[in-house]
Design a protein with these regions (language model features):
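Large intracellular
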Residues: 4, 8, 18-144, 216-265
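Helix-termination/interfacial motifs at the ends of transmembrane alpha-helices
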Residues: 7-10, 14-29, 135-212
Length: 265
């Protein structure tokens, strides 16, 4: 589990509750709970998001919320180490030996690439097939990101709509000045709900998925370059130096260690 994502959401919730209790007291917490405001804001935001995307992407977007808590199985340095290990196997035992090594791999993208080169597929065709799949994966990720970005935009918009509804009702009942304060407070709650939906949930989720997507795309590019280099019969050390160019300088030492471990296997 990615503890950082869970901690961020819970800390934000703590700050919110702390702020409310500090200003209004424990009993005043009820003042921030209004079912009608919640229905207008959340119902309107989710309904208009459904209008904006396909049903398939809507369902996939809702399900993707749990992905922010999933820790990556491998980082890019580990992936480079795995590819160097495979290159050593291919150099010692030949490309056909990679078919057996592929059975122990968990990543379907890497496994697919290995099976393509074991089958003797032309290198350009291997690249084309894998890059096409990479584009397809990135497209699905962008659809999910688009869902959360759309919902983030709809939340404050419907919060403002709810506030306007409350203000209209308040102005119609200005004959009783004692009701103006409470009516204004209720009207503003929808704006609060919309802002919370956008800035506490939707935008952080979207940003996390974008960050995870960038890491995954980099890893898949490393896989493509590494597998094509293995297919071309390049020296494992040359492959390692080539793939390390994907990493920032501070991470290249760990990649060296992974490569040395692979060479000793």
């Amino acid at each position: 589990m990615d503890i950082a994502s869970l901690a961020g959401i819970l800390l934000a919730l703590f700050m919110l509750v702390f702020g409310i209790i500090s200003s209004a007291g424990v009993g005043g917490f009820r003042e921030y709970l209004d079912p009608a405001s919640a229905i207008i804001t959340f119902g309107g935001a989710f309904s208009c998001t459904l209008t904006s995307v396909s049903l398939q992407n809507y369902i996939a977007g809702l399900k993707s919320f749990t992905l922010i808590f999933k820790a990556p199985t491998l980082n890019t340095s580990d992936m480079i180490g795995k590819i160097i290990e495979l290159s050593n196997v291919a150099r010692k035992e030949g490309l056909l030996s990679l078919e057996e090594a592929a059975t122990d791999l968990d990543d379907p993208f890497l496994k697919k690439g290995i099976l393509l080169i074991v089958d003797g597929t032309d290198p350009e065709l291997v690249r084309a097939i894998m890059e096409t799949e990479l584009v397809s994966v990135e497209g699905r990720h962008k659809d999910t990101i688009g869902f959360w970005d759309t919902l983030a935009a709809m939340g404050p918009a419907w919060g403002m709509i709810g506030t306007l509804i409350g203000l209209v009702d308040m102005l119609y009942h200005m004959d009783d000045p004692s009701t103006l304060g409470p009516a204004m407070a209720v009207a503003l709650i929808t704006t609060l709900y919309g802002s919370l939906l956008a800035n506490w949930i939707c935008t952080p989720v979207s940003n996390k998925i974008k960050a995870d997507n960038a890491i995954e795309m980099q890893q898949k590019e490393v896989m493509i370059e590494g597998l094509l280099s293995i297919q071309a019969g390049e020296n494992p050390r040359v492959i390692e130096e080539k793939l390390k160019s994907f990493l920032p300088p501070k991470d290249r030492t760990s990649a060296d260690e992974e490569g040395e471990a692979g060479g000793e296997a």
